[in-house]
């Protein structure tokens, strides 16, 4: 396993360093890069970053051989951009402008991985991931023109127009026939559903009307029973009042007879008392006469 150091700034290291761009680093790992580039010579260092990688060889000739052999290779479904780090490929926007290694790296600046990443992101324009496939264009069916009825003699070639018209009409007739059949089937299904719904509604209405009639009958029966009960109660009250009056009328003559009997008894007692008084006076008179004699 090679080291991760690929940022040495001495001229020998810079000239023997290979840059791999447009690399799908989500799939390709450090071991994969080493396996691909180790066949060109001994690898002193290898570093993998987001979207690109560096391979540091011991010799410049090995680096140039790797660039010549691997540039444009398909790695993980992406075309890799491979060149020497000291001789980067000029971007299309900067065509014709050459930049030296001193301008790119600096003479006395110690590069780190962050600087390398920012620098090469600006130097090379490549996607970090596999670009999405272009959308599949759906087949567009051209709309058919309606056939204009009229005199065919006005057109150029009547025979050719009639044949093409027949072909177009036959195709459109087939399409229309299929469409009509499908529409008819859908309409029949809809009609069946509507009929079933109407039947259910009629059943519900009939049940509701029956329930209403039953409720009305029950109410009328209750009213009749309550009215009959009231009539019976009034009749009973009237009978009870009439009986009381009759008993009162019957009781009056008895009271009169009792009163008459009591009067007769009193008169009889008075008469007896008078008789007793008279007899007592007579006895007194007789006793007085005897005494005088």
Curated annotation (Swiss-Prot):
Residues 206-222, 229-240 have a biased composition (Basic and acidic residues). Pfam families: RRM_1 (PF00076). This is Heterogeneous nuclear ribonucleoprotein C-like 2. The gene is HNRNPCL2. It comes from Homo sapiens (Human). May play a role in nucleosome assembly by neutralizing basic proteins such as A and B core hnRNPs. It is found in: Nucleus. The lineage of its organism: Eukaryota, Metazoa, Chordata, Craniata, Vertebrata. One of its GO terms (molecular function) is identical protein binding. It comes from the Eukaryota.
């Amino acid at each position: 396993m090679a080291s991760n150091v690929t940022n040495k700034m001495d001229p020998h290291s810079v000239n023997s360093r290979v840059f791999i761009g447009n690399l799908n680093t989500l799939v390709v790992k450090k071991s994969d890069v080493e396996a691909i580039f180790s066949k060109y010579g001994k690898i002193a260092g290898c570093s993998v970053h987001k979207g690109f990688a560096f391979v540091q060889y011991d010799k410049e000739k090995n680096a140039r051989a790797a660039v010549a052999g691997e540039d444009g290779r398909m790695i993980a479904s992406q075309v890799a951009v491979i060149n020497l780090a000291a001789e980067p490929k000029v971007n299309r926007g900067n065509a014709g402008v050459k930049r030296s290694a001193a301008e790119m790296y600096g003479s006395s600046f110690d590069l780190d991985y962050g600087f390398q990443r920012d620098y090469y992101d600006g130097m090379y324009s490549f996607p970090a991931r596999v670009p999405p496939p272009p959308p599949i264009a759906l087949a567009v069916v051209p709309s058919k023109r309606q056939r204009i009825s009229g005199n065919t003699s006005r057109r150029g070639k009547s025979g050719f127009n009639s044949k093409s018209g027949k072909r177009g009409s036959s195709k459109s007739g087939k399409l229309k026939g299929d469409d009509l059949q499908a529409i008819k089937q859908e309409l029949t299904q809809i009609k069946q559903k509507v009929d079933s719904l109407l039947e259910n509604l009629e059943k519900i209405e009939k049940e509701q009307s029956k329930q209403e009639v039953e409720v009305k009958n029950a109410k009328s029966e209750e009213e009749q029973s309550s009215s009959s009960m009231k009539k019976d109660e009034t009749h009973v009250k009237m009978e009870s009042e009439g009986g009381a009056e009759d008993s009162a009328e019957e009781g009056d003559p008895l009271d009169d007879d009792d009163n008459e009997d009591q009067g007769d008894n009193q008169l009889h007692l008075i008469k007896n008392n008078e008789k007793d008084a008279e007899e007592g006076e007579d006895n007194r008179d007789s006793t007085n006469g005897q005494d005088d004699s």
